[in-house]
């Protein structure tokens, strides 16, 4: 009876961790979309809400870490049970960093002064954001469902995000060289594109955490990367 009670208590602890991660993930997804939307529409109020929303992300991460450590101390789990708890902490850490990146984009809204808004660049940024947001949702669904094939599909998809980011950098550099008045807007857009690309990297981290949680080992294959977003590599003609 004692063993059964302990098992039920552990399952309850684990379910609560999973619920908290899902709640955190939902907030992060919204932050990504809102931060880019605020930037594109020059919506200062929305940008401020994104910045303010990061505090809740941080709070949830702290709760997840505290509950995870307490569960390990009380239940002394082993093997897959221990990996489940460690994975919850790792996913929460990546989500917190994604929240920081979205917050950074939200802060940039107030700095935009130019009315320069080339439609091609805006569409590229929106497409990149849609792709990354979809990957975040997919990898969190894979984490909750213990769906390894779905997690690996996200892991393999990071290269597409990198390719879009590199293309955007080249376009932005071209606009800056054509007219110095475009520089301020383009620089902010560059940082935002890079932040979205980094969000993709954190999403890939979560996919690797799912692999570790299920398989009990790290992925040995080299992570697919197509990022060439340095100023030198992104110059037209390179």
Give a label for each model feature.
Residues 1-238:
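Cytosolic, long alpha-helical scaffolding segments
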């Amino acid at each position: 009876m004692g063993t059964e009670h302990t098992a039920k208590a552990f399952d309850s602890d684990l379910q609560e961790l999973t619920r908290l991660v899902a709640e955190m993930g939902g907030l992060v997804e919204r932050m990504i979309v809102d931060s880019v939307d605020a930037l594109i529409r020059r919506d200062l109020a929305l940008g401020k809400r994104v910045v303010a929303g990061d505090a809740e992300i941080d709070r949830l991460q702290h709760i997840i870490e505290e509950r995870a450590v307490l569960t390990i101390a009380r239940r002394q789990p082993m093997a897959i049970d221990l990996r489940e708890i460690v994975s919850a902490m790792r996913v929460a850490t990546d989500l917190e960093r994604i929240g920081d990146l979205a917050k950074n984009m939200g802060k940039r809204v107030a700095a935009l002064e130019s009315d320069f808004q080339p439609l091609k660049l805006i569409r590229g940024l929106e497409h990149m954001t849609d792709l990354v947001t979809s990957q975040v949702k997919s990898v969190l669904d894979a984490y909750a469902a213990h769906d390894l094939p779905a997690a690996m599909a996200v892991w393999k998809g990071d290269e597409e995000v990198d390719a879009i980011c590199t293309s955007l950098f080249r376009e932005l550099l071209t606009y800056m060289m054509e007219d110095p008045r475009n520089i301020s807007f383009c620089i902010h857009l560059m940082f935002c594109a890079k932040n979205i690309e980094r969000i993709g990297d954190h999403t890939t981290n979560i996919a690797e955490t799912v692999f570790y949680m299920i398989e009990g080992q790290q992925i040995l294959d080299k992570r697919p990367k197509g990022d060439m977003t340095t100023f030198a590599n992104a110059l037209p003609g390179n």
